[in-house]
Structure formats: C-alpha cells, structure tokens
Amino acid sequence: MSKFAWIVTFAVFSVTPAAAESAIPNLLGTWKGESESIVMGPGNAHHSAAPAAGPRLNSITFTMTIDKQDGRRFSGAFTSARGNDTIIAVISRNGSIYMVDDDGCTIGTILAPNRMELCYMRQSPEARVASCTEMTKQP
C-alpha cells in the first residue's frame, strides 16, 4: 500500500469518531407528540382511569420541554393535560436515549434532528404502562 493510501486510511479512521460524537443534535426547546399506549390497572398520572378488567388502549398528547443540555445529557419536563414529570436523560453514542422520571423509565431513538421516538415503561404491583410517542420539535 502506498504512503498516500496509508495517510488517507488513517485520516478516515481518525475523523469518523469525531463525526459520530458531533452527531448529537441540539434538543433544547419544545417537542410535541401523541402517545400510543396500553395500560393495566390505574396507570399513572398521565394515563389515569379506573382499573378495567383487562388492558386498555389510550392516547395522550404530550409536550416535552428540554431546558438544559450539555452534550449527551439533558433535562426538562414531560407534560400532558393530566400531569407533569421532571425528566433527566442521556444519549448513548449510538443515538439511543435513556430517560427517567419519578415513576418509570423511557428508552428512545433520535430519528432526525427534529424527531425522536420515546417509549415509556412503568411496572408496579398496582399498574403497568407501555407507551411509545413520536415527538416532533416545534419551531
């Protein structure tokens, strides 16, 4: 292999990690989406209802406001007409989002700089919730 080919190969492998690191978009601002949820038991503050005999399907409009971001770490609020949760989160190097609030956890994916999918799970002796919401950043 020629000296030039070695230099090009080295340059490509040196730049790739830096490019991957800078791929994290600016998430600050307001995001909105409609959940697709399934709930057993009384649910949680957002999906509250009288317990049914079996699982029930539910959809809720959510707003997420991200007010702090430092690289891969961010925090803010996740709200609906029924509740408000403070959230903290981190983005993995592969673009996965790991988020927690006071009663459950969320795993998500950055789909585009202005779109993400967040899937929330809660399990307790009284209630279970599984919910996915595609969030779109508002202008």
What do the predicted segments below correspond to?
Residues T30-N44, I87-P139:
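Beta-sheet ligand-binding and adhesion/scaffold domains
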Residues L57-D103:
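Predominantly extracellular/secreted and cell-surface proteins with exposed
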Residues T16-A20:
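Sec/Tat signal peptide C-region and signal peptidase I cleavage site
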Residues W6-V15:
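Bacterial N-terminal signal peptides
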Residues E21-S22, I87:
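Short, flexible, glycine/charge-rich loop motifs used to bind or transfer phosphoryl groups or to couple energy/partner
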Residues S22-S75, E126-T136:
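Short, solvent-exposed loop/hinge segments that bridge or flank secondary-structure elements
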Residues M1-A5:
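Positively charged n-region of N-terminal signal peptides that target proteins for export
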